[in-house]
Design a protein with these regions (language model features):
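Tubulin/FtsZ superfamily GTPase core signature
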Residues: 1-232
Length: 232
């Protein structure tokens, strides 16, 4: 995937956050709504739960969002298949499912969803449905932080290779969300160069195709760059 400088130049910069992140707790279930201020509706709703929660309870909560035009994502701390006998019905409640995610990985996923429309390079929520294969909606998320583009590129490429081997993950669609510490001097041509470089390395080393890129500035980063990859 190659992004041209002219293409980026035509995308208007975000002066005000377009999203608001709303967190709700219902016993052992964390619900994160990514609310679009532009359309006054949720673009994403993420459910984070443990394998001790009964399917009926989660299904009841997801049904409350059924009429919303949102991407609904289920995230289990362990395997969703060991919750109870209704796990198949539960999986079907979600557009996408993630398993065995730590709290840190879940927050990485929230950031990637937030980056969908919040950054200087952005897309649409339903781009995420590209991750869904014909027979399964199981997806994966990994991240890497570093003080240079080379650092995050090397780290993320190695993590991707390990994940593909360990979990026999499908080599299909890959969404990448690049975050950078806030900078007064944002040069979009430099961003384009960085993104194209990362894409080339990832695609060469993993044989995966980078389908979508998001880019936004994050003042809360510990290091200069962070790259979050979501794939099926």
């Amino acid at each position: 995937m190659s992004i041209e400088y002219e293409e980026i130049d035509s995308i208007y910069l975000r002066n005000e956050p377009i999203y608001e992140i709303i967190r709700k707790c219902n016993d052992d279930i964390l619900i994160v709504e990514i609310f679009s201020k532009e359309y006054e509706s949720n673009d994403f709703v993420l459910f984070y739960f443990s394998d001790s929660v009964k399917s009926e309870k989660i299904i009841q909560l997801t049904n409350e969002y059924a009429q919303q035009n949102a991407v609904v994502i289920g995230v289990c701390k362990k395997s969703i298949s060991i919750i109870d006998k209704k796990f198949v019905e539960l999986k079907n409640q979600f557009d996408l499912v993630f398993e065995n995610l730590t709290e840190t990985q879940f927050e990485d996923l929230v950031e990637a969803c937030y980056g969908t429309k919040s950054g200087e390079i952005h897309g649409e929520p339903y781009d995420w449905i590209l991750l869904k294969s014909k027979n399964d909606n199981l997806c994966y998320v990994i991240s890497a932080e570093g003080d240079s583009i080379n650092d995050v590129t090397e780290l993320i490429s190695e993590k991707l290779k390990q994940k593909l081997t360990k979990d026999n993950a499908k080599k299909t669609n890959l969404i990448c969300s690049l975050e950078k510490q806030n900078s007064d001097s944002l040069i979009m041509s430099d961003v384009a160069t960085s993104i194209n470089k990362i894409s080339e390395v990832i695609e060469a080393r993993t044989k995966m195709e980078v389908k979508l890129w998001y880019y936004f500035q994050n003042k809360n980063l510990v290091k200069k760059y962070k790259l979050v990859c979501v794939f099926s």
